[in-house]
Amino acid sequence: MGARASILSGGKLDDWEKIRLRPGGKKKYRIKHLVWASRELDRFALNPGLLESAKGCQQILVQLQPALQTGTQEIKSLYNTVATLYCVHQRIEIKDTMEALEKIEEIQNKNKQQAQKAETDKKDNSQVSQNYPIVQNLQGQPVHQALSPRTLNAWVKVIEEKAFSPEVIPMFSALSEGATPQDLNTMLNTIGGHQAAMQMLKDTINEEAAEWDRVHPVHAGPIAPGQVREPRGSDIAGTTSTLQEQIGWMTGNPPIPVGEIYKRWIILGLNKIVRMYSPVSILDIRQGPKEPFRDYVDRFFKALRAEQATQDVKNWMTDTLLVQNANPDCKTILKALGSGATLEEMMTACQGVGGPGHKARVLAEAMSQVTNTNIMMQRGNFRDHKRIVKCFNCGKQGHIAKNCRAPRKKGCWKCGKEGHQMKDCTERQANFFREDLAFQQREARELSPEQTRANSPTSREPRARRGDPLPETGAEGQGTVSSNFPQITLWQRPLVTIRIGGQLREALLDTGADDTVLEDIDLPRKWKPKMIGGIGGFIKVRQYNEVPIEIEGKKAIGTVLIGPTPVNIIGRNMLTQLGCTLNFPISPIETVPVKLKPGMDGPKIKQWPLTEEKIKALTQICAEMEEEGKISRVGPENPYNTPVFAIKKKDSTKWRKLVDFRELNKRTQDFWEVQLGIPHPAGLKKKKSVTVLDVGDAYFSVPLYEDFRKYTAFTIPSINNETPGIRYQYNVLPQGWKGSPAIFQCSMTKILKPFRERNPEIVIYQYMDDLYVGSDLEIEQHRRKIKELREHLLKWGFTTPDKKHQKEPPFLWMGYELHPDKWTVQPIQLPEKEDWTVNDIQKLVGKLNWASQIYPGIKVKQLCKLLKGAKALTDIVPLTREAELELAENKEILKEPVHGVYYDSAKELIAEVQKQGLDQWTYQIYQEPFKNLKTGKYAKRRSAHTNDVKQLAEVVQKIALEAIVIWGKTPKFRLPIQRETWETWWTDYWQATWIPEWEFVNTPPLVKLWYQLEKEPIMGAETFYVDGASNRETKTGKAGYVTDKGRQKVVTLTDTTNQKTELHAIYLALRDSGLEVNIVTDSQYALGIIQAQPDKSESELVNQIIEELIKKEKVYLSWVPAHKGIGGNEQVDKLVSSGIRKVLFLDGIDKAQEDHEKYHSNWRAMASDFNLPPVVAKEIVASCDKCQLKGEAMHGQVDCSPGIWQLDCTHLEGKVILVAVHVASGYIEAEVIPAETGQEAAFFILKLAGRWPVKVIHTDNGSNFTSGAVKAACWWADIKQEFGIPYNPQSQGVVESMNKELKKIIGQVREQAEHLKTAVQMAVFIHNFKRKGGIGGYSAGERIIDIIATDIQTRELQKQITKIQNFRVYYRDSRDPIWKGPAKLPWKGEGAVVIQDNSEIKVVPRRKAKIIRDYGKQMAGDDCVAGRQDED
């Protein structure tokens, strides 16, 4: 009781006992009420510890308040008690419980008003864009503030990582807040590589723009002076409006928010794209029985973001569906939390819940409580538990020093001094907190308590110096320890001033020396001669014992040697007394909290065997790391393990330790990549002084989150399992762990932040452990700043070794070579080889790609062609003549060194593009002619058929994105193309909304469109109706044309396809026509290729068509669907399809469309019933808005017996639908039933058994299916009933999926029926007879009949086979006249029989076989029986 009564103490307890239970009553609150309240909280799964603070009481009140209306008297009493306790904690004066409740209500009303006011302020503030505001300049005019490179980078990163998942929409909405149409088009341009998605977006924008123009017609008459014109749809999309016009509309009075309107259109298009990529309904998101609640919530909100609904509806979905669709374990907890629970509270409450593991933990917890109670009752008292022992030797709990397995520490276990044991120690206080002293030359560094806490990698407790009070007995009892530790760095020799015998001397602190050796000093005391060995040989010294030495205010007494030493040395015999340690600095910054993924545990992978030399190498490496504090030993209580191994360093005999963290990486939480890419020197501004630094042992300088360290455990085995393996865990960021880069970058950024704020004139580029520091200061001043930076980093535990400290140019940084006024890539040497392997060529291409960013003209296309196909890395690849020529050209380019210059923000960016031929392009970005910032190349072909203008557009897009990332703005382009050619192409290209600023530059070869297709039919020109057909089996085909002037032609083709024949027909028409021609085709494939106006292709046939198109003056190409009603096409179709294809005209299209509008048949059913090609049937389904809500369900035949049915109840519109599915065929019987009772289920089962052969029904464990009525019906109809596994939807998988499919079909036909029961039967009919697919391409109705008929035939056949097997056969082989047998008779046919003689199976003609009945053993072998008992 004492523990629970400690909720209040001192004066608060007195106040508590003065409060009356009721107004005017005699009874007052006592300690027993607190004890009762804490026990009640246990009952309601709330933490009793919350009662100890006002904040905790407030949390309890929030949880209990929703249950007051419907709760029991105990809940109300508990609420009143906690409310009174809250007032006592807050020192609110009250006389009784009623006053406490009034005070609580007053506080809650006040908080609610404040929250509403804050929400109102937030709404008011949200009206103004905070992201890209249109700000006013000094003249009061509105000016535009463009998107930042960081915003565009974030947008590109989201698309790359999320790939149009639902998260993309809120991210786009957030990033584009307040953006103008021009900003929005820039965002779309940066992801223009996603052509299919962008085409869908373009269509949506065009539709919305057309709708805008329809709703907002243009006013007749001229615009009044000073009045702004009204925006059209194309103006809102940024196509026909300028930036100034957009600003004018957005800031006018009244404003027209063209940016928000355009943004809304884009979001509509993004929603369509998201639905295509993520066709999952929110109703289908249910938590699996063993699925962690966090994963379920992630899936739920991902689907919710893709839903087309208002925010109110989405809020309702979150409040109801999230709980409703959780698994039973989580649902129980969520309902107990109440309706007002936040998502964070739900996730905390449900953490680790679900599955057998959760049930095992609950059971174990209950059992442990029972066990503990029994033990305490057996003891008969409530004394404290047995005190945990602690080892004097290793400091760990659980054992004493006598049983310690660790190596025995030198000196006394009590005080740490050498020369005596613990039993002889005179110290009064044991010093478990060993000293952690180090020395600094000038002044001690003050560390904050937080920094001190993180300073030790192995223990998070602060370490106290000898003589200071222990944390528990500090001056103020708070456990703080003085942390004025002297410290000295190792940038130079660690020399300190010492006092010995009243004399001052300078000495070197040497952790490698055993003894203290000094020279030129006289000590007035006894000594004895001694010989010691050193680096220079042996020297004679005088040994003085018990000599006092004072170093940095610390005193020590020990042995001192005096002799001719080159330098005074303080050895370990003195350093250990002073508590001096050699500290490898580990950053004192706060650790970043890290967790495993929800529901996952750490890796438990066994260590694989290692060779002796690897074990020795790992043992040595780990011993050094342990001494440095990077790792520490763990015992058997840590159950986790990750394999470790060793490899030899490149070109070295030294070993390197590697830990295989792949499994831990899978289980560790995800991290956001802090840095989106590496910095580029072309983006650096020219600086007067530059320094490049490298952080040494980067990862090993940052501490790992303490609670996560146990998961990094690894084991070093012993040879032949001689001893148990030595187990370690990491205290710092491990190499190879997925979180190390992100945490290091984050830590480094925090550390550099104060230095950057203090020194804004210093530019620091940080990428992992590489630092580029630039300034316009004079060199001496700059170096002082560098020294200050290095000291700042060292304070936080980051060393910057002299070895990698670059003070003078050229600076080697990130693979680049930096000079004061120029930069280049580090020298590249191309190898000279006779034989090239795949790996050699890969490395060569990598080097050339790296060089191409500053060396213009580099080409790699022919070299890359050598790598096509699946080849091993060691395969020898002969260089083609083209590849040799390309390599020779590249070598010539690399002979002369080329340099780039630095960026000047005051000058304009210019990008110039040149065509190199063979689909290769090169470009330079510069600010002054012949002084390139950087260069690059482009050699991608995104499609098989392309043209130069399209490729140039792709180059422009790549350069624009690259420039935005490096400089934050797009350059002005100089392109080798005439403006008319460019604008002709871009008019039809989707990105017409964003055209960069550019000018024509006459750099041969120029880009041009070699031909142009007409938009309207050419009057007077001959019209060619073309068609082609191919037989899939024979690969033969025909192509031909018919003209409006009576000409016709057909050619036969071999080894062809339908697509090739369609293209060949167009080629024939072009070849045989005049300079002007109209061509009509029915091939969307051919039309798509030619309308893109390619001037090169991978297809020889398309190249021939291009050659013919270039010769023409005018060409008009048109498409007609299915040739219907077009005479010319009807004629040519008959010509080319004769003997090639059976169905030519698709007369069934209208009937199929009518059928689909009524029944919403799937494409297979329509293709089968109306003889339609699959592409046409699919197009009918695709054009139906009701069939595009979700992807079409795939139906397959399950391997189950013909008599098995699955039954389940589903709910729709508040009514119950009982569904039965024939498992083998997918056939459905369903009807709406009045109530979910056993009687209704039994009646339905009897009806089902009267229609179909039902042998087994499989149901869930619902009360209706486990009722006596259902059991009786099953007994009467001789049906076996089986039950599913509780909470496992997979056990009812067939009927569960059919429930979804049935609801989907009901949704498609619901508006055709007044009542739900009618719609259900219509949906059953459609599913059973209007949807085809699966094995055999049958509908479900056809399939069940086929299965039952086949089953009957099989059974009858089996009876015949059984009957036949009662006969034996005597037979003759070919010319052998002797009868053989008897043999078994597996099968009897009309002209032959199948016999089995021993293990051999033969087919024998009936005329050579005699079949007799098997009468038993006595008749076997009797020759005459063969004649008498002949069955024939």
Swiss-Prot record:
What GO biological process term is on the record, naming one? DNA integration
Q: What else is known?
A: HIV-1 lineages are divided in three main groups, M (for Major), O (for Outlier), and N (for New, or Non-M, Non-O). The vast majority of strains found worldwide belong to the group M. Group O seems to be endemic to and largely confined to Cameroon and neighboring countries in West Central Africa, where these viruses represent a small minority of HIV-1 strains. The group N is represented by a limited number of isolates from Cameroonian persons. The group M is further subdivided in 9 clades or subtypes (A to D, F to H, J and K).
Q: Which GO terms describe its molecular function?
A: aspartic-type endopeptidase activity; DNA binding; DNA-directed DNA polymerase activity; exoribonuclease H activity; lipid binding; RNA stem-loop binding; RNA-directed DNA polymerase activity; RNA-DNA hybrid ribonuclease activity
Provide the catalytic activity annotation.
Specific for a P1 residue that is hydrophobic, and P1' variable, but often Pro; Endohydrolysis of RNA in RNA/DNA hybrids. Three different cleavage modes: 1. sequence-specific internal cleavage of RNA. Human immunodeficiency virus type 1 and Moloney murine leukemia virus enzymes prefer to cleave the RNA strand one nucleotide away from the RNA-DNA junction. 2. RNA 5'-end directed cleavage 13-19 nucleotides from the RNA end. 3. DNA 3'-end directed cleavage 15-20 nucleotides away from the primer terminus; 3'-end directed exonucleolytic cleavage of viral RNA-DNA hybrid; DNA(n) + a 2'-deoxyribonucleoside 5'-triphosphate = DNA(n+1) + diphosphate
Q: Where is this region: Interaction with membrane phosphatidylinositol 4,5-bisphosphate and RNA?
A: 14-33
The organism is: Human immunodeficiency virus type 1 group M subtype J (isolate SE9280) (HIV-1)
Query: How is this protein annotated for GO cellular component?
Result: host cell; host cell nucleus; host cell plasma membrane; host multivesicular body; membrane; viral nucleocapsid; virion membrane
The opening ranks of the lineage are:
Viruses, Riboviria, Pararnavirae, Artverviricota, Revtraviricetes
- Give start-end positions of Basic and acidic residues composition bias: 460-469
The protein's name in its UniProt record: Gag-Pol polyprotein
